[in-house]
Swiss-Prot record:
Residues modified as Phosphoserine: 121, 123
Domain CTLH: 156-231
Record's keyword terms, sorted: Cytoplasm, Disease variant, Intellectual disability, Mitochondrion, Nucleus, Phosphoprotein, Repeat, WD repeat
Its job: G-beta-like protein involved in cell signal transduction. Acts as a negative regulator in MAPK signaling pathway. Functions as a scaffolding protein to promote G beta:gamma-mediated PLCB2 plasma membrane translocation and subsequent activation in leukocytes. Core component of the CTLH E3 ubiquitin-protein ligase complex that selectively accepts ubiquitin from UBE2H and mediates ubiquitination and subsequent proteasomal degradation of the transcription factor HBP1.
Name this protein carries in UniProt: WD repeat-containing protein 26
Impact when changing residue 284 to N: In SKDEAS; uncertain significance; slightly decreased protein expression;
Organism: Homo sapiens
């Protein structure tokens, strides 16, 4: 506006100069023209001004400067007719030129930013889909929609989404139609590769039939629960039976027609009933037949996190707590690490009531008592305090003239059998509750009864020794069965109630069946087997082998799994044990006065416990208190091991030296 007055003066002074500039005589700078255009003081009201704007914005090819500009175009303030249009055109042209210039600068940056947007990798897309599925399960549907929109990913195939919704709504006809839409996706080669864990013999057509069968089965059960027997019968006859799949299951389904009420149906079918729970389970089964590119497996993120936590626990050398698959019980923000101070490698108590070498120790099955046998001819039963985990003397069982070298608790912990060394022909059966001797058994003065094991029924036990005796007896000491010529070193009864494992003088472990009187070789070593014990599941055997140490065998595959290092094992009988939660650990005494502890998967010891002054003959891990362990030694003491207290750190380091493997 103020520039227009200056333009008028310039025009009066000399129009030729303005013509030479091809528009410079308009007397308006580009900056002011842009400002005027932005303020709405001039607008492209003619076709020429619109064309100039189009040229400036690059929408049309550039045209040469107009030669018709003259001094008349400067008379906008002088009221000259037609001057306003020319001035307006010039103003817009200048503004457009400025806009074009700025656009030419901004456009490359915008294009560059678009080009710089990172393309998601396959793993990134997988993570986004996993997060989306998890959020969806939490009900954060809007968040999932925004996540998928911004990332450009797809949570699942649209046909799979329809299928899911129709299954959860119980719209079985539509769900069956959706299944037909999903058929090409199931038949794709990619689907075959992803489902590699399924049986190879399954044909693609068979997969569709199986999925359809599951759908119709749910439909049938829901009809029955609703009392629509005729509709259910129609599904059974006209839809399920023609599939010609799993006829045995169809016979079972037909039997549900006889159920008188819904509760009876749910009980017999082991089915939650019509609703979200049963349909969700159905959907989980159906998802296993679809490739993850179409529909993610159920709760996939939780599955991966659970696997990660389990792997960390497996790799933790000192993990000795109950395995909990609930992710809420652990922190996902840090790695799982157990402290060695939580491990039973600190002496909590020293029991000194025996007055000679202690040859054996064994916790009861319920973990409330400990029995120790000694050369001093006594068995002492100790009570475990459930709160302090300290032991106090409960009973002393006397009269074992040759000493006590082996003890076995009955399955119900009501009885205890004690054996002596090689030259002992007697066996004592004690009532633990009363402390009374129920049976003192001896078949012959020439017998050697050095080992004993209880049958799982608690009514029988087997015993034997190195002089060729191998008997099965009842609680009164009556002989039930016997094997001749078996020189027994150690015994164990398997959970089947029929098979007895026995190590003998031929450096082997054989299985003896007392029902059909058959036997078979299971383990063969190259050196004498001094003792052995079996894991709770009956799969693993832990052997103390003369001059070799501790060996772990797989009884099912009959292979040597691992040889544990560090222990000193000569020809003394040393008893090792499984222990800890899930029996992940192995402990053994040693002739170098130490107790060695290994993680089951590691050959090197994770702890060496010192304190005894002579050979450690036996170690027993409390089956109910994973942080408690007992060791018996020729030094006449029994040591109780537990976690370290929160003080006395120096003594902890001295008594528990650890080596990570």
């Amino acid at each position: 506006m103020q520039a227009n007055g200056a333009g008028g003066g310039g025009g009066g002074g000399g129009g030729g100069g303005g013509g030479g500039g091809g528009g410079g005589g308009q007397g308006q700078t580009p900056e002011l023209a842009c400002l005027s255009a932005q303020n709405g003081e001039s607008s492209p009201s003619s076709s020429s001004s619109a064309g100039d704007l189009a040229h400036a914005n690059g929408l049309l090819p550039s045209a040469p400067s107009a030669a018709s500009n003259n001094s008349n175009s400067l008379n906008v303030n002088n009221g000259v007719p037609g001057g306003a249009a020319a001035a307006s055109s010039a103003t817009v042209a200048a503004a457009s030129a400025t806009t074009a210039a700025s656009s030419s600068l901004a456009t490359p940056e915008l294009g560059s930013s678009l080009k710089k947007k990172k393309r998601l990798s396959q793993s990134d897309e997988d993570v986004i889909r996993l997060i989306g599925q998890h959020l969806n399960g939490l009900g954060l549907n809007q968040t999932v929609d925004l996540l998928m929109q911004e990332s450009g990913c797809r949570l699942e195939h649209p046909s799979a989404t329809k299928f899911r919704n129709h299954v959860m709504e119980g719209d079985w006809d539509k769900a069956e139609n959706d299944l037909n839409e999903l058929k090409p996706l199931v038949h794709s080669p990619h689907a075959i590769v992803v489902r590699g864990a399924l049986e190879i013999s399954q044909t693609l057509l068979g997969i569709i039939v199986r999925m359809k069968f599951l759908l119709l089965q749910q439909k049938y059960l829901e009809y029955l629960e609703d009392g629509k027997v005729l509709e259910a019968l129609q599904v059974l006859r006209c839809e399920l039976t023609p599939l010609k799949y799993n006829t045995e299951r169809i016979h079972v389904l037909s039997g549900y027609l006889m159920c008188s009420h819904a509760e009876d149906l749910r009980a017999k079918a082991e089915w939650e009933g019509k609703g979200t729970a049963s349909r969700s389970k159905l959907l989980d089964k159906l998802q296993t037949y679809l490739p993850p590119s179409v529909m993610l497996p159920p709760r996939r993120l939780q599955t991966l996190l659970r696997q990660a936590v389990e792997l960390q626990r497996d790799r933790c050398l000192y993990h000795n707590t109950k395995l909990d698959n609930n992710l809420d019980s652990v922190s996902l923000l840090i790695d799982h690490v157990c402290s060695r101070r939580q491990f039973p490698c600190y002496t909590q108590q020293i029991l000194t009531e025996h007055c000679n070498e202690v040859w054996f120790c064994k916790f009861s099955n319920d973990g409330t008592k400990l029995a120790t046998g000694s050369k001093d001819t006594t068995v002492i039963i100790w009570q475990v305090d459930p709160d302090t985990h300290l032991l106090k003397l409960l009973k002393t069982l006397e009269g074992h003239a040759y000493g006590v070298s082996y003890i076995a608790w009955s399955p119900d912990d009501n009885y205890l059998v004690a054996c002596g060394p090689d030259d002992c022909s007697e066996l004592w059966l004690w009532n633990v509750q009363t402390g009374e001797l129920r049976t003192k058994m001896s078949q012959s003065h020439e017998d050697s009864l050095t080992s004993v094991a209880w049958n799982p029924d608690g009514k029988r036990f087997v015993t034997g020794g190195q002089r060729g005796q191998f008997y099965q007896c009842d609680l009164d000491g009556n002989l039930l069965d016997s094997w001749e010529g078996v020189r027994v070193q150690c015994l164990w009864c398997l959970s089947d109630g029929k098979t007895v494992l026995a190590s003998d003088t031929h450096q082997r472990i054989r299985g003896y069946n007392f029902e059909d009187l058959t036997d078979r070789n299971i383990v063969q070593e190259d050196h004498p087997i001094m003792s052995f014990t079996i894991s709770k599941n009956g799969r693993l055997a832990l052997l103390n082998v003369a001059t070799q140490g501790v060996h772990l065998w797989d009884l099912q595959d009959r292979v040597l799994v691992r040889k544990y290092q560090g222990v000193t094992q000569g020809f003394y009988t040393i008893h090792s044990c499984f222990g800890g939660h899930n029996e992940d650990f192995i402990a053994s005494g040693s002739e170098d006065h130490k107790v060695y502890i290994w993680h089951k998967r590691s050959e090197l010891p994770i702890a060496e416990l010192t304190g005894h002054t002579r050979t450690v003959n036996c170690v027993s891990w409390n089956p109910q208190i994973p942080s408690m362990m007992a060791s018996a030694s020729d030094d006449g003491t029994v040591r109780i091991w537990g976690p370290a207290p929160f003080i006395d750190h120096q003594n902890i380091e001295e008594e528990c030296s650890s080596m990570d493997s």
